[in-house]
Design a protein with these regions (language model features):
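C-terminal motif of bacterial Sec signal peptides marking the signal peptidase cleavage site
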Residues: 16-18
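Bacterial signal peptide processing site
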Residues: 20-23
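Extracytoplasmic beta-rich repeat domains
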Residues: 27, 42-65, 94-109, 132-149, ...
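Short coil/turn segments within WD40 beta-propeller repeats
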Residues: 80, 120-121, 160, 205, ...
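Short loop/turn segments that connect beta-strands within beta-propeller blades
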Residues: 86-89, 126-129, 166-169, 212-214, ...
Length: 384
């Protein structure tokens, strides 16, 4: 697949300067997003509960996402408020205000809730009551969720560095410099942390597995090779969290490829041309990607063979895909939640979540989907 000069120009404005296509100041110059198509609703979407936890700064809507552990959902907002919600009814179990500008989170691991700040601070909170366990300082702004395996906390920073902090004290154990290029998409990949591996994507298009104890390299794989004469053309960032399914890792780059790799060795199993800054999703033996220009695509997980593409949400600023029961869900900047059939990608359901729009990655919890809107409302949906 090739990406047009138009797409490159549009996306450079969208991701680097933070422009939006809905409600812009210069309506004559704006490129019009796709109108919503009419279709027959095949599923009934039920709102289980909704709770307000605070609003998101426009620059950090993509990086503040909910996370879950057991019967609790943890959320955060840009003003430093971190909230624990009961997963069954959305009621607040606790809420604390850190009085800092939170830019990345929320992460969970080993009984801790973790967030990062604009100033490069990492906060670890007790998941039972929100009390601060420790704080730590890293090199720069944190716009991804810290992750922990109970021994370390992995934190990626906007200058493309990876830090491993002691999970008990917050002290630095090791760090890795991703050697960031001159120009990159604003965003960082979220690490996947297990007992024997820290898996991280970098702005160079490399996916790297580290020993969590000392940071030594286990393997390194390049998903995409920078091409072109300009720095803009050569951007191949990995900004979406790698997806681990059994012994296979799925990851996608901007202006590059979607790939499946062996967890143990990093050996490539298949590649397909693709471009995305979202994490892929997996369901029913297929991998789903929200690509730039907001096409949603499905690939066979085993071979990478393309299955379908839905281009009817062009430039609606979609979230990454998520699973909701037997459907694939994406949300957009106008606040609509769209459900697609995993077999051929046609629309099967739609509901208006909130007029403020949805930017944060959505969270699948069992048969429910947790959606955090830009105005700070957190809502749980399921199919009737």
């Amino acid at each position: 697949m090739k990406y047009s000069p138009l797409a490159t120009a549009l996306l450079s404005s969208l991701f680097i300067t933070g422009c939006t296509w809905f409600g812009g100041d210069d309506d004559d110059a704006a490129i019009t997003p796709a109108e919503l198509v009419k279709f027959k609703q095949e599923v009934s979407i039920k709102r289980q509960w909704s709770t307000s936890i605070g609003s998101a700064n426009q620059d950090y809507r993509n990086s503040l996402r909910p996370t879950v552990n057991g019967d609790s959902i943890f959320t955060g907002d840009h003003e430093g408020t971190v909230t624990a919600l009961n997963i069954s009814n959305g009621k607040k179990a606790w809420q604390v205000n850190l009085d800092v500008s939170v830019s990345g989170g929320v992460g969970y691991g080993a009984g801790m809730v973790m967030v990062g700040t604009i100033e490069g601070e990492v906060y670890a909170l007790d998941a039972s009551d929100g009390s601060v366990l420790w704080t730590s300082q890293v090199s720069s702004e944190v716009i991804s969720s810290p992750k922990s395996n109970g021994e370390i906390v992995a934190v990626q920073t906007v200058d493309d560095r990876l830090f491993a902090l002691d999970a008990t004290t917050g002290e630095e154990i090791w760090q890795h410099d991703g050697d960031a290029p001159i120009l990159s998409v604003r965003g960082t990949s979220e690490s996947v942390v297990t007992g024997n591996m820290v898996l991280s994507g970098f702005d160079t298009g490399k996916l790297v597995a580290f020993n969590p104890d000392n940071g030594s390299l286990i393997w390194e794989s390049r998903l995409a090779v920078p091409k072109g004469r300009t720095e803009l053309e050569r951007m191949v960032d990995i900004d979406g969290e790698p997806l681990l399914v059994g012994d296979v890792i799925y990851a996608v780059t901007y202006q590059g490829r979607l790939g499946a790799l062996s967890r143990g060795t990093g050996r490539s199993l298949w590649f397909q041309d693709s471009s995305s800054h979202h994490a892929p999703a997996y369901s029913q033996e297929q991998v789903y990607v929200t690509e730039d220009e907001d096409a949603v695509r499905a690939f066979k997980a085993g071979s990478g063979q393309p299955v379908w593409i839905n281009e009817q949400l062009f430039l609606r600023q979609l979230t990454g895909p998520a699973r909701l029961a037997g459907t694939i869900a994406v949300a957009d900047a106008e606040g609509y939640l769209h459900l697609l059939d995993p077999v051929d990608g046609h629309f099967v359901g739609r509901v208006k979540v909130d007029g403020s729009g949805v930017s944060a990655p959505m969270l699948t919890v069992g048969e429910s989907l947790i959606v955090q809107a830009n105005d700070g409302s957190v809502t749980a949906y399921r199919l009737k």
